[in-house]
Structure formats: C-alpha cells, structure tokens
C-alpha cells in the first residue's frame, strides 16, 4: 500500500525536480520554502484541541477506542516526530479519563525478527517494546491482546508481548502463556467502582488460540465466553460492578454487524456484560442498546496506516457514570491522518460517521446529536446499586474479621 505524502514531503520533491532545471530559481525560493516547512510542522505540533468537559456528579469517566497499530508506516511517523505526535489530537480525552482501553493489534518483539517463527498468513504486524510504554504514557490503563495478529510471530512473539506488558506494569486481557493464564480477568477499582475487563477474539488462524501448553489468544467459544462474563459479575466470584468486554469479531471491511455478532452480543449482555467494545473490521459499525447494555459492534481503527476513506473514519467513546446511575456516552467522530486520530470538524465528515454509527441501531435506543458528538443515554443504576451493596458487604466482612482478631487477642 503506497503511503500518502505529507505537505512537507511534496515540497521537498518539488525542490529536487526544480533544482535540476533551474538552480538559480531554487536559490531564490529555497529560504522561503524552508520557512513554510518549519511553520507547517509547528502548526501540526501545536494545533489546539478542544478541552474535555466533565459533567456534574460524575462517578467515573471511561474512554474506549478501536484498533491500535504502531508498526509499518506509523512507526516511520513515530521515529520522525515521537509517540506524542500520534496521540496529540486525542490526548485530552485519554488524560482526562479514569480508565482507557483499546485493542493492541500486534505482538511485541524483543529480538530481531529472524529469531521468530512467522505464522502461515499474508500480513504480519509487530511493534517494539517501547510501544507498550508509549501507550501507557498516553493514558491507556488496560489493553486487549485477543486478536488475529497476536501470534503473527509465533509463541515466542506472544510470550514477548506478555513480558513487555508485565514489565511496563500495564494491564492486558485476552492473551496468555496457556489456557489457564489466558482466561485472566482484569479487575480495577475505578473511583470506587469495581470494573472487570475481558477480551476475546473470533478472528484467528490455526494455532493462534491458547491451549494447556501453548500461548495464544482467548477465543469467543460461547461456552467459555459466557462463563467468564458470568464469573466476573457473580457476587461470590469476581463481584464486579461494571463489566467491559472486548470483542475482536466480524468481517474485515464489512460495515454491518453479522447475525453471529448480534446473537453473541445479546448473549453477553444476558450473561452480565454492561459495555461491549468491538473491533477487527477496520471500519465503523453501528452501536446498539440491549437491556441497557451498550454494544459497539466496531469502533474501527484508532491508530493505523490504512488509506481507504472508510478505514480512516473512527470513533472514540467516553462513558460517564453519574452518582444517580445515569450513564451518558459521548461518541466522538474521528478521522485518522498520518496514523493519528483527530476529532472531525467538517459537517460532511461528521454526518458520514454519524450515519455509519447509527444506520443499524434499534429504534428504542436513546441517542442524539449534541455539539461535536453523539450522546447516548443509559440507565445504569444497577452499577451504583451493586457498588453500594458490595461496599456494605466488604465493610461488614472487615468488621467481623477485626472483631474475630480482637476476641482471639483477649483470650
């Protein structure tokens, strides 16, 4: 795939061509062009981003995005400008969140590529160890590793990825060194709310799924999928107040969720999922609401180098939970430019993203266009009620334990 040239690169090519024909002309205009190049770069680096507004009585703010791929042409941009450059337009959203998740669409390689056994497939993605530290510094708190590229460089690549995440102290879901490890659920206390995060993939090649002895990803086998979600919500097991499920599913470049996606989504909500975040198609798919569970079938790419218009359309979701249990989700339309996600300003582009996000949405869903985003309203009182009930039980358990210690001490 040929990368689109930047304004600066086009100018440099123009200079080279003109220099051969008219060196004297170049000597005159070269200083002026140098000023233009510097100014253009400065504008790109310092372009203002709208501040993120917090609502009153917010309990927590969570941000969720789609596929993150920091290799190939994105790596060239990072090498030139730094990682901050890639996230510069969305940094306020990431930094002003209590929880940030996305799909990490490649393994981390700690050695030269020749030391790895490539998977039998056409496209192989990879990233360097510093990428994990970079996404953590950008604001991500947990990432999904269950996807069709995690085993691109074999078992060794998957193990290196897990090692890199552990060394960076960044939580991950959906991949592990064996079947027991891959079923790990991440529990995080987010402003008093116990949030469980899970990750599964329905897109994989032979040998990519974790077994008793082999590292890999966690598949969307319905038996395992639904048991894991129920476990996360069960008061006697995970006891989570809010359950977020990452799903790598659907068909690539298909902007409509498949019947399988729709059936699995409803089954997941019935099992206890509150938020389902889909990725893999590389294009946007509509969201839907089922029994107050929110389903984003595909948020498309987030950081990627694909050049097709539909693969450059993206969205960022911010989940705001209020103290009274009202959940408001802001869906911010984005467009990917030079690998970097940027909030859309053109009315035409906004409407294209809005249309794609809502064309298959059920009629009963409560949503509206507000300011520069879609706003979705949900009744998530059950999350607050579960949190209060859990806190009360934890307090009672603590008191009983302290009383028991006191009795043992006095006797």
Curated annotation (Swiss-Prot):
Biological processes annotated in GO: capsule polysaccharide biosynthetic process
Annotated segments matching region Disordered: 386-411
Membrane association type: Single-pass membrane protein
Regulation: induction: Capsule synthesis is transcriptionally regulated by AtxA, AcpA and AcpB.
Pfam families: PGA_cap
GO cellular component: plasma membrane
Pathway entry: Capsule biogenesis; capsule polysaccharide biosynthesis
Lineage: superkingdom: Bacteria
Localization (cell): Cell membrane
Compositionally biased tracts (Basic and acidic residues): 386-403
Keywords annotated in UniProt: Capsule biogenesis/degradation, Cell membrane, Membrane, Plasmid, Transmembrane, Transmembrane helix, Virulence
CDD domains assigned: MPP_CapA (cd07381)
Family: Belongs to the CapA family.
Chain's role: Essential for the synthesis of the polyglutamate capsule of B.anthracis which is one of the principal virulence factors during anthrax infection. May form a polyglutamyl synthetase complex together with proteins CapB and CapC.
Protein name, UniProt field: Capsule biosynthesis protein CapA
UniProt source species: Bacillus anthracis
Gene that this polypeptide is encoded by: capA
């Amino acid at each position: 795939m040929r990368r689109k040239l930047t304004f600066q690169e086009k100018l440099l090519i123009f200079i080279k061509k003109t220099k051969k024909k008219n060196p004297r002309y170049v000597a005159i205009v070269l200083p002026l062009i140098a000023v233009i190049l510097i100014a253009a770069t400065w504008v790109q680096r310092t372009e203002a981003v709208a501040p993120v507004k917090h609502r009153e009585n917010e309990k927590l703010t969570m941000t969720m995005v789609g596929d993150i791929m920091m290799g190939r042409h994105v790596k060239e941009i990072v090498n030139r400008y730094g990682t901050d450059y890639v996230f510069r337009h969305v940094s306020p959203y990431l930094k002003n969140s209590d929880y940030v998740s996305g799909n990490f669409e490649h393994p981390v390689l700690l050695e030269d590529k020749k030391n790895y056994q490539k998977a039998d497939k056409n496209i192989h993605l990879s990233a360097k160890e510093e990428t994990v530290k970079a996404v953590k510094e950008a604001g991500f708190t947990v990432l999904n590793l269950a996807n069709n590229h995690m085993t691109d460089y074999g078992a060794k690549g998957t193990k290196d990825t897990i090692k890199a995440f552990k060394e960076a102290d960044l939580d991950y879901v959906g991949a592990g060194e064996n079947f027991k490890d891959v079923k790990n659920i991440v529990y995080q206390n987010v402003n008093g709310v116990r949030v469980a995060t899970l990750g599964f993939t329905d897109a994989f090649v032979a040998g990519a799924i974790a077994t008793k002895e082999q590292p890999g990803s966690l598949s969307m086998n319905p038996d395992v999928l639904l048991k894991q979600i129920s476990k996360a919500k069960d008061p006697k097991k995970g006891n989570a107040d809010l359950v977020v499920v990452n799903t790598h599913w659907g068909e690539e470049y298909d902007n409509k969720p498949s019947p399988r996606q729709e059936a699995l989504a409803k089954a997941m909500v019935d099992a206890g999922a509150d938020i389902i975040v889909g990725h893999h198609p590389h294009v946007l798919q509509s969201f839907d609401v089922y029994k107050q569970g929110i389903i984003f079938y595909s948020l498309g790419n987030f950081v990627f180098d694909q050049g097709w218009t539909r693969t450059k359309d993206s969205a960022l979701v911010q989940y705001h939970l209020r103290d009274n249990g009202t959940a408001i989700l802001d869906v911010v339309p984005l467009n990917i430019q030079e690998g970097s996600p940027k909030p859309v300003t053109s009315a035409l582009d906004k409407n294209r993203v809005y249309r794609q996000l809502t064309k298959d949405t059920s009629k009963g869903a409560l949503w509206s266009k507000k300011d520069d985003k879609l706003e979705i309203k949900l009744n998530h009182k059950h999350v607050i009620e579960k949190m209060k009930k859990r806190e009360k039980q934890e307090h009672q358990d603590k008191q009983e334990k302290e009383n028991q210690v006191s009795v043992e001490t006095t006797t």
